[in-house]
Swiss-Prot record:
Protein name according to UniProt: Small ribosomal subunit protein bS16
Biased composition range(s): Basic residues: 81-90
Sequence ranges of Low complexity compositional bias: 102-124
Keyword terms, alphabetized: Ribonucleoprotein, Ribosomal protein
Organism whose genome encodes this protein: Bartonella tribocorum (strain CIP 105476 / IBS 506)
SUPFAM superfamilies documented for this protein: Ribosomal protein S16
Biased segments, Basic and acidic residues type: 91-101
Alphabetized Pfam families for the sequence: Ribosomal_S16
Classification of source organism: Bacteria, Pseudomonadati, Pseudomonadota, Alphaproteobacteria, Hyphomicrobiales
Record-level GO cellular component terms: cytoplasm; small ribosomal subunit
Length: 124
């Protein structure tokens, strides 16, 4: 049985509240779970206690092979329970082909304009 440590949504409409649960991956998001190991209240201010974790039980479930989801892994990394690997995608921040062509054309136009301006100043 593959286990995930994930968020289960509670609360009312437009007032979310999430329980951090250990559940089978085949269970629905808000459905059956094995154990509730924490809570996250995103409506609280940033400096308040937004995330509550039962660290002892989370360590137990991680030892049993449970995999945290990305959002829960961020919480565990902030609490120092599990290290979140750094993403390595160096090409994501680069512009696409069309944007690179536009940049090259603008650079060429600027160089041509600078050369023309220098030629005009040299002839005078």
């Amino acid at each position: 049985m593959a286990l995930k440590i994930r968020l289960s949504r509670g609360g009312s409409k437009k007032r979310p509240y999430y329980h951090i649960v250990v559940a089978d991956v085949r269970s629905p998001r808000d459905g059956r779970f094995l154990e509730r190991v924490g809570a996250w209240d995103p409506m609280l201010p940033k400096d308040g206690p937004r995330v509550k974790l039962n660290e002892e039980r989370i360590q137990y479930w991680l030892g049993q092979g449970a995999q945290p989801t990305d959002r829960v892994l961020r919480f565990l990394d902030a609490a120092g329970l599990k290290k979140r690997p750094a993403r390595n995608n160096p090409h994501k921040g680069e512009p696409g082909k069309k944007a690179q062509e536009r940049i090259a054309a603008a650079k060429q136009a600027a160089e041509d304009a600078a050369a023309a301006a220098e030629a005009d100043s040299a002839s005078e």
